[in-house]
Amino acid sequence: MADTTFDIDDTERRMRGALQSLKQEFAGLRTGRATASLLEPIVVEAYGQSMPINQVGTIGVPEPRMLTVQVWDKGMISAVEKAIRSSGLGLNPNVDGMLIRLPIPELNQERRAELTKIAAKYTEQARIAVRNVRRDAMDELKRLEKDSHMSQDDHKSWSEKVQKLTDKVIGEIDAALAHKEADIMQV
């Protein structure tokens, strides 16, 4: 019996996608230092549709504790300002002509704890996504065995490989959380 009908690479790709998605979510969590990626999750209502902030202006980091957004269309300034205020990042935009300045305030202990909880929530969502991919892979393996496309031994072997992969990716997710928590709590 051939076991080539199961694609563990696809399973790994999907699990790694959950990890990448988590890292993008983490990039949007403020740590007290200015980074352009902090504004990436912000969506602006522009021209009748939702657009990422980097499609309506240029994001700059002129100082370690300052971000700027150079808006390309004067009519978009209020929409960009509104999107930043409603983003939940705790930023207070200052409009200066076509430039929006965003001073990055020092994080207080309460906000650090709140950001840590948000990071933990994102991490749990990533773990769930990985477990869902694992479940899909296990269901596929059961189906292949049931349809006689795979022997019991091959099924057991592939199941163990999927479980090892799951454990590895969840370990990487947990390591990413530990790194982000340390970053947030650093004064």
UniProtKB/Swiss-Prot annotation:
Keywords: Cytoplasm, Protein biosynthesis. NCBIfam families: frr (TIGR00496). It comes from Parvibaculum lavamentivorans (strain DS-1 / DSM 13023 / NCIMB 13966). This is Ribosome-recycling factor. The keyword Cytoplasm applies. InterPro entries: Ribosome_recyc_fac, Ribosome_recyc_fac_dom, RRF_sf. One of its GO terms (biological process) is cytoplasmic translational termination. Belongs to the RRF family. Pfam families: RRF. It comes from the Bacteria. HAMAP family: RRF. Its main location: cytoplasm. One of its GO terms (cellular component) is cytosol. Responsible for the release of ribosomes from messenger RNA at the termination of protein biosynthesis. May increase the efficiency of translation by recycling ribosomes from one round of translation to another. It is found in: Cytoplasm. GO terms for molecular function: ribosomal large subunit binding.
